[in-house]
Regions:
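Short glycine-rich or small-residue beta-strand-to-loop segments that form or flank ligand, phosphate
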Residues: 15-20, 104
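Non-transmembrane, aqueous-exposed alpha-helical and coiled segments at domain scale
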Residues: 1-16, 30-33, 37, 41, ...
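Cofactor-binding loop segments of dinucleotide-utilizing enzymes, especially the Rossmann-like FAD-
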Residues: 21, 44-47
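Glycine-rich oxoanion-binding loops at beta->alpha junctions
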Residues: 3, 169-176
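Functionally constrained cores in energy, signaling, and assembly domains
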Residues: 17, 23, 40, 120, ...
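Short glycine/serine/threonine-rich phosphate/pyrophosphate-binding segments
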Residues: 24-29
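Electropositive, gly/pro-rich neighborhoods at or near active sites that engage anionic ligands
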Residues: 46-172
Length: 176
């Protein structure tokens, strides 16, 4: 059975496209949702730390965390569903993983592609607008610092910048 193409019904308000990731983007989406239904969130998939990094490595899928956060921000669901998406396990082998990330990982496992999994989760959550991964390729962030050092991996870049107190000269996406 071929999955139907994801179409956003005509919505009210100005058309807004946002690009980013992390807590900042999801917080902005919560605010934008109050003013327009025409939101396209283009979300980073370069995270390599925490639970997203583990799912990325173990399951060979794009990191789900930033995508999940954006869908959670745009969701039109019952409060218990928001609570579930945000829930983090505290014990055992799932400690640190969020239910929302695992839910998206499970959808990825039963879908033909990560894009299809994102569309399915968007439908389940009845999100306002749409959430799109910035790329479907497996990519890493690479940063070149003023001192000449080059670091690969979002989590390592943050750590190196904090430890070295050195400014980043250039950032680029590289295929993994």
């Amino acid at each position: 059975m071929r999955e139907q193409e994801y179409r956003v019904p005509r919505a009210h308000g100005p058309k807004v496209a946002v690009i980013g990731g992390g807590h900042g983007l999801s917080n902005m989406l919560r605010g934008l949702k109050q003013y327009t239904e025409n939101i396209s969130a283009i979300v980073t998939v370069a995270d390599d730390g925490g639970g997203s990094g583990m799912l990325r490595q173990d399951l060979g899928m794009p990191p789900p965390g930033d995508i999940r956060s954006c869908m959670e921000a745009l969701a039109n669901t019952e409060p218990v569903m928001r609570e579930l998406l945000h829930y983090r396990f505290t014990e055992g082998s799932l400690a640190g993983h969020s239910f929302g990330n695992l839910f998206l990982a499970a959808l990825n496992g039963i879908s033909p592609s990560f894009d299809a999994a994102v569309r399915r989760m968007s439908q389940v959550l009845a999100i306002t607008g749409r959430v799109l991964p910035v790329t479907t390729a497996d990519v890493q962030l690479e940063a070149e610092f003023e001192n000449g050092a080059t670091v690969v991996g979002e989590s390592k870049i943050f750590y190196c910048k904090k430890q070295e107190d050195c400014r980043i000269r250039q950032v680029r996406l590289i295929p993994s």
